[in-house]
Amino acid sequence: MSSGAWAAATGLLAAVASVASDVHAGDALDEDVLAVTRKHCVMCHARVPSHPSFDAPPKQVVLESIGELKAWAPKILEQVVWDRNMPIGNDTGMTEEERGLLERWIETLK
């Protein structure tokens, strides 16, 4: 293999490794976000809420999957991160670190 072909192959491998690393990091961040929303959100914002005050998700907002969280990301940023209206009364004790994680995750979606 010529030195030019070798350099091209090495560059291609580095690019593939970088993309794979980014995908893995994104998956890990998604899992962290899901853990936060399971802890603080889905008792109300589930297809079948477990919170005794709700028979259906408030305002039909379901936050059980990454796809649903992505769809609601602008509202999550507003209600949870900026205005701190959610969780209601912060009954579940969401921390600033958890709010920061949600904000960083939402930034990756842009």
Residue ranges and their predicted role:
Residues 1-7:
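Membrane-interfacial entry segments at the cytosolic side of transmembrane helices
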Residues 7-17:
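Bacterial N-terminal signal peptides
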Residues 16-110:
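Aromatic- and Gly/Pro-enriched helix-to-coil junctions and flexible linker segments
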